[in-house]
Amino acid sequence: MPSNNLIKNALISVSDKKNIVEVAEKLIINKINLFSTGGTAQILKKNNIPVTEISDYTKFPEIMDGRVKTLHPKIMGGILGQKQKDQEIMKLYNICPIDIVIVNFYPFEKIKNIKKNDIDNVVNNIDIGGPTLVRASAKNYKNVIVIVDLDDFQSTIDSINNNTMNIEKRFNLASKAFEYTSYYEQIISQYFIEQNSLYKKTNNSLFPNEINFSFIKKQDLRYGENYHQKSSFYIEKNMCDSGTISTACQIQGKTLSYNNISDSDIALECVKQFTKPACVIVKHGNPCSVAVSHNILESYLSAYNSDPISAFGGIISFNCKLDEKTAQTIINQQFVEVIIIPEISKKAVKILQKKQNIRVLVTGKLQNNTVGLDLKKITNGLLVQEYDSHNIDYNSWSFVTKRSPTKKELKDSIFCWQVAKFVKSNAIVYGSDEITIGIGAGQMSRIYSTKLANIKVKDQGKNIIGATMASDAFFPFRDGIDEAASVGISSIIQPGGSIRDEEIIRAADEHNITMIFTKKRHFKH
C-alpha cells in the first residue's frame, strides 16, 4: 500500500456536482493533481481550479455525446495499476497512477420514477463509465482511495493529512463503493424486468424469479424483542415518502426499541385509514382501542376510556396535529411509551418535554403509501405478498339477513371492519359510535376471541346493547353469533364464505341481528 504522502493524483467524475468545487479546492490545497471529465472539468475551470481534462490526458476525445470518455487504457491502467509491480509497464505507456477516485452516477433511479419519461430517456441515464471506475478502484483498494459519498471526503482528507489512511479505512470505502454499484445494478435490473413485455406475458412481474432488496441502517435500537436481543432499524434506500414510521423524526424521548417501532407502525397505519380526527392505542402488536371523533382530544379520551387498563404503557397515534390540551391530558391520564403525530404545536412540544422519557415521533403529512409488497422473514426464506390494502367497496358487500342495517349500524360496521384488519387473528372487534368497546385478539378459535371481547365488556361494566361486531374471517359455527347476541350485539360484519353460512345467517335472524358479508378476509398473523 502506498504511503499517504505519495497520493498525488485524483480523478473526479460526478453527475451530482453539489459541493464538488469545495472538494476540489481541498484536494488542490493538498497538492493533489486533478483529472476530470468534460462537465465536471468545466465547472472546476469556471471556479479557477486547475484541472486536466481526461480527453487531453488520453489524447482521445469524448465521443458519442459523451457516452465514451473514461473507458480508456490510460485511465483504467492508472486505477488498476499496482505501484509495486506495474511501474515499468505504466512508464512504458505513459500511464499516470491515479490515487483517489471520486465518482457518483447518472441519476437513473430519479429519472425512472418520473412518469413522463419514456424508456429511451430512462435508458440514456444508465451510467457505464462511472460504475466501471468505481469497481476498478474498489478492487485495487490497497492503491486507490474510492469515494462515492462526499460525506466521506473530509474524514478521508484528514486521514491523508495525518498519515492515518490505513488499510482498514481504504477497505471500508471500497466496501461502500461495491454496495453503491450493487444497488445501482439492482434498480436497473428491476426496471428492465418491469418493462419487459415478454416477461409480463409469461411470468408474474410482481413476483420475479429472483428478488433483491436494499436497505440502509437508520439507527441502532435500545434492544430487540427481548432485552437479551440486539437490534437495529433499516429503511429502504432513497425513500422519501412522508407519513411513515421509517421517515418519522423523533423529537424527544429514549432510544426506540424493536417493539416500539413494530407497534408504532401498526398504530400509524391503522389511524391513517380515518379522515376525521382519530386515535389508535396499540399494545403488543394489537390495537387495544380506537376512536374517531370531531376533535383530537375527544378521540383520545374515547380511545383511552374504551380500555384504560390495556392503554397503560401503550403506543398512541393520531392522524391530526397534537395540541397542548391533548398533550397535557395524555400525560395526566396514563403512562405512554410512544406518541405518533403528523405534526405538533409548539406548546404541545413544551408540555411533553416535561416527560423526557416519552418518545415522540413526528411523521409529516400522512398519505396512503401502504401499497406494494409485504415481507416476512422465515428460517432461510422470505414470504412475499401484496400488502393488504383492500379498500372499502360497498357495492361488493351483501346484506344477507332479513333485517338490513340502520344508518348507525352501517357506519359502525365500516369502522369496526377497518379496525379488524389490524387485529391479530382470530380477531373480534366490538364498536359503537366509531369507538371500540371490546377487542378479542389472537385466539386460536374464533369463539374464544368472542368470549374474550365479552369478558372485557363485562369487566368494565359496559352496556353494549346495539353495538356492532366485526370478525376478520368467517364464522365456522353459530356459537360466535350466539355469544355476541348474549351481550347485546345488534349488527355483524364478516367476510362470509363458510360452508355453514346458511346456519350462521339463520342464527343472526333468530337474534334479530343484521349481518353484512364483505367477501374479503383480513387474516393477520
Curated annotation (Swiss-Prot):
Pathway: Purine metabolism; IMP biosynthesis via de novo pathway; 5-formamido-1-(5-phospho-D-ribosyl)imidazole-4-carboxamide from 5-amino-1-(5-phospho-D-ribosyl)imidazole-4-carboxamide (10-formyl THF route): step 1/1; Purine metabolism; IMP biosynthesis via de novo pathway; IMP from 5-formamido-1-(5-phospho-D-ribosyl)imidazole-4-carboxamide: step 1/1. Keywords: Hydrolase, Multifunctional enzyme, Purine biosynthesis, Transferase. SUPFAM superfamilies: Cytidine deaminase-like, Methylglyoxal synthase-like. One of its GO terms (cellular component) is cytosol. Residues 1-148 form the MGS-like domain. Pfam families: AICARFT_IMPCHas, MGS. Its EC number is 2.1.2.3, 3.5.4.10. One of its GO terms (biological process) is 'de novo' IMP biosynthetic process. One of its GO terms (molecular function) is phosphoribosylaminoimidazolecarboxamide formyltransferase activity. InterPro entries: AICAR_Tfase_dup_dom_sf, Cytidine_deaminase-like, MGS-like_dom, MGS-like_dom_sf, PurH-like. It catalyses: (6R)-10-formyltetrahydrofolate + 5-amino-1-(5-phospho-beta-D-ribosyl)imidazole-4-carboxamide = 5-formamido-1-(5-phospho-D-ribosyl)imidazole-4-carboxamide + (6S)-5,6,7,8-tetrahydrofolate; IMP + H2O = 5-formamido-1-(5-phospho-D-ribosyl)imidazole-4-carboxamide. Belongs to the PurH family. PANTHER family: BIFUNCTIONAL PURINE BIOSYNTHESIS PROTEIN ATIC, BIFUNCTIONAL PURINE BIOSYNTHESIS PROTEIN PURH. The IMP cyclohydrolase activity resides in the N-terminal region. This is Bifunctional purine biosynthesis protein PurH. The lineage of its organism: Bacteria, Pseudomonadati, Pseudomonadota, Gammaproteobacteria, Enterobacterales. The gene is purH.
